[in-house]
Amino acid sequence: MAENQNNLIWIDLEMTGLDPERDRIIEIATLVTDANLNILAEGPVLAVHQSAEQLGLMDEWNVRTHTGSGLVERVKASPFNDRDAELQTIEFLKQWVPAGVSPICGNSVGQDRRFLFRYMPELEAYFHYRYVDVSTLKELARRWKPEILAGFKKQNTHQALDDIRESVAELAYYREHFIQS
């Protein structure tokens, strides 16, 4: 393992909803790639404990999705609060990327960053202010080269580590079929 300023930090959060003023983080996962999108390491995948009251605020989609994946039970049983998950994640990242150099990478990471800012501010500050948002390329491909969209199928497991791996693979797909074409 070697700290490298060109490595990229990828993150995905699962939340109880989309509003950081009301909803909470229930799972966090990170991984690190090199600049060529080769996965170097996967960080801890942590269910973040939330109260039954907080979980009761989830809408039907979140209840169905996170119950079906087993995440709700993992959240109820988890010994980790927001701060525990934040610190474990930062300790992992320090081994691979210095603070303040990697953009936050993933799909729709602007949403994740809003939750990090509210509930895990030290982790949010670990990232550079820039973004590598795969969903931007997807939206551009939808408008400029829609025929390539059928070539990449997501599994949509809504499990944080699976989602990050898919984001890395999706960016590699767009690099080959959209950016370099």
From Swiss-Prot:
InterPro entries: Exonuclease_RNaseT/DNA_pol3, Oligoribonuclease, RNaseH-like_sf, RNaseH_sf. Keywords: Cytoplasm, Exonuclease, Hydrolase, Nuclease. It is found in: Cytoplasm. The active site is at Y129. It comes from the Bacteria. The keyword Zinc-finger does not apply. GO terms for cellular component: cytoplasm. Disulfide bonds: none annotated. SMART domains: EXOIII. Residues 8-171 form the Exonuclease domain. Coiled coil: none annotated. Its EC number is 3.1.15.-. GO terms for molecular function: 3'-5'-RNA exonuclease activity; nucleic acid binding. Its main location: cytoplasm. One of its GO terms (biological process) is DNA metabolic process. HAMAP family: Oligoribonuclease. 3'-to-5' exoribonuclease specific for small oligoribonucleotides. Belongs to the oligoribonuclease family. PANTHER family: OLIGORIBONUCLEASE, MITOCHONDRIAL (PTHR11046:SF0). This is Oligoribonuclease. The gene is orn.
